[in-house]
Amino acid sequence: PGTYQEAFPLNVPMGVTVKGHSLRSVELSPTSGTQSKDAFLLQGDSTVEDLTIKDFFYNSGANEGYAFKFAPNFRVYLRSPYVRNVTVITQGTTTSNTDPRGFASGDAGRGAYLDGSIANADSKEAGMLFHSVTFITPGVTGLKVTNGSRVEWLNCFTYFADKGIEIVDGSAGLKG
């Protein structure tokens, strides 16, 4: 248990599990210099579970600031990356009494971006599984899926998002 500040992004190699004690007793946030970076970049056969990710922002110029993305050139040999029992809590940079989560800022950290175009050509699939995950992402997209990626979304929720789930048919990508 505890609160941890880490330099984002955290790269999770193939077959590795990042496991907290429980989502309410382990909180992960970025260092001040990495607040607008992605939190986790996942390879295939990896897992992140039992923690809360918070206090990061979205950088629209670099399309960074997601809790979860595929690692560049990722591969899935046996199973997709798996995210379980995780809460993502973000807010915009400008908050007020009438907008306590910064919905109007439009720069709160986002939940996940799944882009099948960055999969390695020999990857079995370009998918990610979410189970019992909550994205509190005010004024921004909670989950975006594009370019042939797949998502399993089991018992998950988005709150305060401008778009809870956005699925875009891209022009590139594995199995797209």
Where are these regions (language model features)?
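N-terminal extracellular ligand-recognition/capping segment immediately after the signal peptide
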Residues: 1-17, 21-36, 52-57
